[in-house]
């Protein structure tokens, strides 16, 4: 599978902002399954070292990735996820993303 340029740019922006707290991305949803269409969004989990405030980081991620969305004309849906909870599969979304997603 070819990783969309928008995802590469997201990774660069997030790594630059979070530094060592950034543990990677998980691409999941229709793009990861190879079933995306022209109107599909790009679903990402942003893996971060805990602890963090979910809503504050969600807001920050939206702000960081907004320029990428404008430049690439791609809708990006990105959510922060604590690395330990993702790896432990404590939430259904994390279990689904682990099963079908691509860790970047």
Task: Show the residue positions of the predicted features.
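Catalytic core of pol beta-like nucleotidyltransferases
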Residues: 1-23, 32-38, 49-104
């Amino acid at each position: 599978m070819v990783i969309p340029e928008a995802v590469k740019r997201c990774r660069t922006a997030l790594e630059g902002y979070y530094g060592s707290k950034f543990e990677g991305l998980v691409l999941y949803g229709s793009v990861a399954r190879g079933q995306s269409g022209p109107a599909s969004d790009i679903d990402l989990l942003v893996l971060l070292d805990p602890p963090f405030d979910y809503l504050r980081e969600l807001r920050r991620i939206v702000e960081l990735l907004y320029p990428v969305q404008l430049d690439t004309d791609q809708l990006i849906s990105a959510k922060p996820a604590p690395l330990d909870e993702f790896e432990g599969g404590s939430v259904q979304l994390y279990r689904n993303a682990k099963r079908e997603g691509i860790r970047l």
